[in-house]
Amino acid sequence: MAAVRVLVAPRLASALLPLSRYHRAPSQRAALHSSAPRPGARVALVLSGCGVYDGTEIHEASAILVHLSRGGAEVQIFAPDVPQMHVIDHTKGEPSERESRNVLAESARIARGKITSLAQLNAANHDAAIFPGGFGAAKNLSTFAVDGKDCKVNKEVERVLKEFHGAKKPIGLCCIAPVLAAKVIKGVEVTVGHEQEEGGKWPYAGTAEAIKALGAKHCVKGVTEAHVDQKNKVVTTPAFMCETALHHIHDGIGAMVKNVLELTGK
């Protein structure tokens, strides 16, 4: 047996050596991907954690990344380095008592480790910014989930929105995230879908009234559509505000991304 171990050990070590690189910390400033043969639009993707009930809606983030990749964009992912409002046990839909998580650390799961603190995001280095939904947008990027129309927006999120808007660079938001633009950008036009629940198809339809109360204009759109506010260069789509098949949500996000990229002029 000793002889067998002597023979096997070096071979095992050699076999595992190529895998070791996957355990190294990736460069935080590296783009997640760059699929264009020539420089395309540089897009900042802002996450709010990992998981629909207390962070980023993962399917939305993935759909955005797929459509950005297809559009030849270079993507860099950001998230605020702050504690989550709370942690939800996604098997029960209930808060996990005595547990806390960090928004940046959780968002890194979606970014495959390639993530940067939102405090380092400078609009001058990017052509557009996109915010996926998930309750993290209403809990970690703002207090909308608790305070509704009287909500406050995270100071770094507010800064980023104002910087991109001031520079006339496009901003994309989906699902519940349009409330961020409604709060920060005066008179902006956004959509979160329909304004009536319609038998449960639009369970969060009441959000439209809160958006109006914030001084924004709500525009009714279907789940596969995106609304483009040409004046403010803000593009929104309902995504998971609608109870529907995943491919419809994917298509709506595709419409949002397409319009954002077109507005960059790249």
Swiss-Prot record:
The modification N6-succinyllysine is found at K201, K221, K231. Keywords: Acetylation, Mitochondrion, Transit peptide. Residues 1-39 form a transit peptide. Transmembrane segments: none annotated. GO terms for cellular component: mitochondrion. It comes from the Eukaryota. Its main location: mitochondrion. It is found in: Mitochondrion. InterPro entries: Class_I_gatase-like. The modification N6-acetyllysine is found at K149, K155, K162, K201, K217, K221, K231. Belongs to the GATD3 family. This is Glutamine amidotransferase-like class 1 domain-containing protein 3, mitochondrial. The lineage of its organism: Eukaryota, Metazoa, Chordata, Craniata, Vertebrata.
